[in-house]
Structure formats: structure tokens, C-alpha cells
């Protein structure tokens, strides 16, 4: 069975981000040698370019592959564009392994804390989950906001 680590809400910024705590967390995560790390948004606090640059340096400290979806803080100040440039695709995405599938949804909107998954994205997710049942794969749906 694969070992997957979930992290969220790092809020990398000049103020309020505790680098020492993060570095300790990275060491503990790397020590357990996970197969994947899933990051479910709010990597940055304000979506500023310099926050994303700083965040990519921190994320580079992980030994395992990273699967990331954006949060509402990442979408601020055109951060969704920087997310795609430096982290990866913001929109719906999928990664498959022999044992599991991670389905990533984008529930973020700038300055809207409640989040939203629209109908087209929901239908796409349903299709992916149906395929997971057919293929008998363990499935994980990753998004920043709560489902209910």
C-alpha cells in the first residue's frame, strides 16, 4: 500500500510563515519516505509572485513527488497564473499509479473563502471516479475547500 502525505495551508509569505517549523516538518516527512505528497492549496498567503518563488524553494526540499491544487489565497493577485507557471496546472488534473489515482479539483476563487466546484468539473470528476471503479483503483479526490 502506498504511503501518501497530505499537507495544506502553508501560507508562505514574508510575515507569519515559520520557516523553522516547515523545515522540521520536511525532515519528518522525508524520513518516512512517502510515495507522494498531496498539497491542497494555500501554498502562498497573497498569491504574489515572490511568495510562489519562495514556496518552490521550500517544496524542492521534499524527496517525494508533489501533487498540488490551488487554494483561494493562491488565486489572489493573479496568483493562479503564477501557480501554473511555477507549480503546475491549476485546472482539473489526474495522476495515476498502479495502485491509486489522485483526482485534483480547483475549488479556488480569488478572495472567496467558501470555494466552488462547478458542474463541468463535477461531471469530469464523476467520470474519473467511474473509471477508477472499473479499473479497481483506490481513488483520492484532492481539493482545497470542504466538500459539504
What are the roles of these predicted feature ranges?
Residues 64-91, 98-103, 107-111, 119-120:
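Active-site neighborhood of divalent metal-dependent phosphoester bond hydrolases
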Residues 27-36, 115-148:
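His/acidic metal-ligating clusters that form di-metal
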Residues 7-8, 36-42, 66-72, 106, ...:
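Active-site neighborhood of phospho(di)ester-bond hydrolases with catalytic His/Asp-centered motifs
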Residues 12-14, 43, 108-119, 148:
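Surface-exposed cleft-lining segments at the edges of enzyme active sites
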Residues 15-18, 41-60, 75-88, 114-115:
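Metal-dependent catalytic neighborhoods of phosphoester/phosphodiester hydrolases
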Residues 1-54:
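N-terminal active-site segment of His-dependent metallophosphoesterases
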Residues 62-66, 136-137:
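A short helix->loop->beta-strand "cap" motif at the edges of active sites that frequently abuts
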Residues 1-5, 94-104, 130-138:
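Beta-strand-turn-beta hairpins that frame and shape the catalytic cleft
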